[in-house]
Each structure stands twice: as C-alpha cells, then as structure tokens.
A protein has these predicted regions:
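Amphipathic alpha-helical polymerization modules
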Residues: 1-45, 151-251
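Polar, low-complexity export/assembly segments characteristic of proteins
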Residues: 21-24, 28-177
Length: 251
C-alpha cells in the first residue's frame, strides 16, 4: 500500500496537539480567581488539560471509544489498516457522541450551561459572557482532537484524508458559530456600556446634590427652620381658636 511521507502526519499532529492545548488553556482563562467560561461555576476551571498527567477524562473517553471501535489503540502500528470508510463511521458515530450531552459534561467540561447574570440597571438583568458548553467550542474541541489523537502519525493516506477533511469542515463550522456568539456578547457589552453611562450620570447628580447640601450655611438653615417652626405653631394656635369659636357658636 502506498504511504505518504512519514514526516507529514507528524507535523500535522504536533500542530494539532499544540492547538488543542492552547484551546483548553484559553477556555480556562480566569480574572481575579473567577473562570470566564465556567458559567455560574466560576470558581472551577471548566476544562482539564487533555494531555495532562494523570490522563484527563476526555482523553480516557477518546481512548476507550477508539479501542471499542477498532480493537487497537491509537499508537498501534495496525492503525495503518483502518479504512477510510471505517474511519468515517467512527467519526460520525462513537467519536461525535463524545462531544454531545451527556458525554461532554461527564468528560470534557465542568462549566454550567447557565451564564453569570448581572444587574446593569434597577430594572435590567442580563446574562454576561458565555460558557465552555456552547456548540462552537465543542466543535473546535472535536476538530483539534481528530487531528491530535486519532492515530494521525500512522493512518494510511485515505484515512488521513478523511481526518483532515472532516476536521476542516467541523472547524469551519465552529469558527462561524463562534463569530455569531461573539456578536451576542458584543450586544451585551453595548448594553453594559450604556448602563455604565447612565449610572455615571446618576452618580454625578448625587455627588452634586451632596456638594449643594454641604455648601449650605448652617446658621441660615437653622434660622429658616426656626421660622418654619414658629409659623407652624401659629398655624396650630389659629386652628385651635377657630375650632373653639365653632364650638361656642353651635353649643
């Protein structure tokens, strides 16, 4: 069987492994101890290092699925005998299922589907950001894993073409969906910016009110208050006399 140059797949696999590791690291981004893509589970990193030690749950799940499908591991030289048709069946079946629920939540991500909610005005609450469970992230993880850990160093040309073609399609879909998700986040950011401007104006108004109160002459205020009290006392006295006159008239 004709084989391509052995160095070619190694280059592709190495790049894919680096890309998968960078992808996981980005989804584990944290700010002030809170993980940005974890949803409301923001105190826990949503993803494990796929190639970490000990092996991640995702890596173990992929290994188990590959072994169950082909009866060999990804590093077995017999991977060269996997046909294009068999690889297609695996990618569309058992492998794809690893990125759907419940497998995704069990093996890949501890993120919550519920995003963090923030009150941006007295009567407006919005979900801010997104989480590692959305479709584009799953598709990118799938594409990187196809190239990084399905025997790309050893598979024959036809099976390798199945891997690269499928990974390219899935990655393109993921990138497109991610752009749409970024647009949604951008809309939320605009709402937050608008709320910030409104709250800034409100704060300026309150600060000006405090300044105005602090600039009032205490003596003048006291004098005016005493005058008001005196006026009230006179009013009560007059009212009382009128009531008495009314009673006298009708007794």
């Amino acid at each position: 069987m004709h084989r391509r140059c052995s160095s070619t797949p190694h280059v592709g696999v190495a790049d894919a492994r680096d890309a998968l590791s960078m992808f996981v690291a980005q989804l584990n981004t944290s700010i002030d101890g809170e993980f940005v893509f974890a949803g409301i589970n923001s105190d826990v990193a949503p993803m494990e290092d796929y190639f970490g030690t000990p092996a991640s749950a995702a890596k173990l799940a992929v290994d188990a699925a590959f072994l169950a499908e082909f009866g060999i591991t990804q590093s077995d030289p017999a991977v060269a005998n996997i046909t294009a048709a068999d690889m297609t069946t695996f990618l569309d079946g058992a492998f794809a299922a690893l990125f759907d629920d419940p497998a995704w939540g069990a093996n890949w991500s501890t993120a919550s589907d519920q995003d963090v909610s923030s009150r941006i005005s007295p009567d407006t609450v919005i979900e801010t950001g997104t989480n590692a469970n959305i479709s584009p992230f799953r598709k990118l993880a799938m594409a990187f894993t196809m190239m990084a850990d399905l025997g790309g160093e050893t598979v024959n040309d036809q099976a390798f073409k199945v891997l690269t073609d499928k990974a390219s399609v899935i990655a393109s879909q993921g990138i497109h969906e991610l752009a749409l998700a970024q647009g949604d986040v951008g809309v939320d950011q605009q709402r937050i910016d608008r709320a910030d401007r409104i709250m800034s104006l409100q704060l300026d108004t309150l600060n000006q009110g405090i300044i105005n109160l602090e600039s009032v002459d205490p003596y003048e205020t006291s004098t005016r208050l005493n005058q008001l009290i005196s006026q009230l006392e006179v009013s009560y006295a007059v009212t009382g006399r009128l009531q008495q006159l009314s009673l006298v008239r009708y007794i």
